[in-house]
Amino acid sequence: MALDGKLVRGEFVAADDADQWCDAEVLRILRRRSLAALRAQVEPVSTAAYARFLPAWQQVGRSATSGVDGLAGVIDQLAGVPIPASAVEPLVFAPRVRDYQPAMLDELLASGEVTWSGAGSISGSDGWIAFHHADTAALTLATPAEIEFTDAHRAIFDVLGSPGESRGAFFFRQLVQGSEEDVKTALWELIWAGWVTGDTFAPVRAMLSGGRKPGTRRPAAPAHRQRRAPRLSRYSVAHPQNRPVDPTVAGRWSALPAAEPDSTVRAHFSAELLLNRHGVLTKGAAANEGVPGGFAMLYKVLSGFEEAGRCQRGYFVESLGGAQFAVASTVDRLRTYLDGVDPERPDYQAVVLAAADPANPYGAALPWPARADADAGHRPGRKAGALVVLVDGELVWFSERGGRSLLNFSTDGEAQRAAAGALAELVSSGRIGGILVEKLDGVPVLEAAAHPDRKVTADALVDAGFARTPRGLRLR
């Protein structure tokens, strides 16, 4: 009967007898009922509690890590997530790595431990960037976007090779067979489409700064990791260059690895990765990730994980349905964020995140809060350049790129003052250049005095140091 799969041998009850047998179908029923009982024991936390939990889970703010090893761990957790290039260092890495320096990222890239890929251009010089651990890059890389290849594109491929068939890393001048400007344009088209990568992040920084070389700041000291001997720069060359290299094409370029074609292998890896990234994996979070096969594919894998005891399915966060998955230890940590569980937690704790940051649950695991006076022309979204300010897990403000338009979601004046203080701290830290608020909820900010609710928001900004200008309220 055991050979036929009708009986299962194991240790099912506490007893001296080592040999215990159970009918296979009865065991399945017991397992299902045990899992159901386990789910019923877990009281769901509020959505605000989850919004407090997620940034801390991703090491934002007080939970920040440090050093190059810490940055490597952050990249492991965020592997494959498209992030606006303009937000990568000041708004995503810096809040997670307390001593972050650009040299740390360049060290990981130069060592080959980490690679980066483009995931689409945005307006101007910005674009979406994803990072990958070298050992698992094939499992987190997206399939490159299809573009119409020109002779310049094909000439680059002739040197670099195609994805999965890289011929090595080459300097820009080794790629040039015609006009340098044409090759530069073609190279960046391949970068944003996800075909080509570089061994330094310097070209992306140069592109974001308009192609200028950083000339006024003293370069940071190399941030070598502990327990590692200093390594030589990969871009040192035996023969000096006679002409300066355009900073937007500096370093060496190579073809990216090919993405893993086996959907089952990718689904299993993605399920583990997303559990680690989100703590509690929900349908909304999975949909925002754009996983091939969607949540339906992940659900099958996660159900298998549950049966194997690798995770739990339950109703962990209220209002998000019963199809939620988490590791048991994660659920225990989530419950420490229950409303009122920690009376010593300071009220009005604010955190500013890039709207597209995976640590922002709104617009992904959680829906954007509704606004009674919603303006069709100003809606929140996980957009490049946009910011969200969360106070005690509640979305208080949504700011468009540069702060031009600010949407308020709170009637709590103290929460808004905390939000304004967090924005002011972001500017004073130098992580962003400045903020100019021109509109509040679609109304010119200089007319806020005529609207009591908007006046509270404007006053909070002024109290935080924003100055009145002919265009609006500015802080820099």
Regions found by a protein language model. Give the residues of each.
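Long, charged, low-complexity, helical-prone intrinsically disordered regions
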Residues: A2-R476
